[in-house]
Design a protein with these regions (language model features):
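Feature captures the catalytic cores and cofactor-binding loops of soluble hydro-lyases/lyases
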Residues: 1-171, 177, 185
Length: 185
């Protein structure tokens, strides 16, 4: 699925249903691997996150292709993805379950929030976790991580099928996140 729209009514209904209930409903329909493993909320008291997935895939960093100067490149896949993520979408990052370097930090999360993003999910770590927890954007990650993403992650593909926390995530899949974690519909 390349794009998905979700009605306000559906978004509101899903916002009232726990991820546990959604997982059981999906399991009854034969879908067993829909929970994103290891992606926990920075602030479990934030409202439930609901929106279509917009994805970014990281691969292991190669030092000669991933120097600090790439941050100056507006065409860099990470920067480009942040600017292309549609309002109301959930930005989902495949960090290969590696939290040793951040998937993003407060600058990018603030930009996504200002652009109307419904939330952020990674199976990796985040820089500036305490600052991000104060932002008005639901955010899910494995753990805080101070090193910049460039030390271990190289942004590669935008809005393609990814694996996040061992769950398949296709662009446009509906992501629901609450205090227990995130599920892919």
């Amino acid at each position: 699925m390349q794009s998905s729209t979700i009605s306000k009514a559906t978004r509101e209904k899903l916002g009232r249903v726990s991820t546990a209930t959604i997982c059981t409903a999906l399991f009854k329909r034969g879908l067993r691997n829909q929970m994103i493993q290891g992606a926990l909320p920075l602030d479990p008291d934030k409202p439930t996150m609901v929106g279509p997935a917009f994805t970014l895939r990281y691969i292991p960093a190669r030092e000669d292709l991933n120097p600090i100067t790439v941050f100056q490149d507006r065409g860099h896949p990470q920067r480009k993805a942040v600017e292309e993520c549609p309002p109301g979408s959930v930005f989902v990052v495949d960090s290969r379950k590696d939290p040793r370097a951040a998937s993003a930090g407060s600058i990018l999360l603030t930009r996504l929030m200002k652009r109307g993003c419904a939330g952020f999910v990674t199976d990796g770590g985040l820089r500036d976790a305490a600052e991000i927890a104060k932002l008005a954007i639901p955010t899910f990650h494995q753990r805080p991580s101070a090193p910049t993403n460039l030390t271990l992650h190289q942004a590669m593909d935008i809005n393609v099928p990814i694996g996040c926390g061992d769950a398949p995530v296709f662009p446009g899949d509906i992501i629901v996140g609450d205090s227990a974690g995130c599920v892919v519909i």
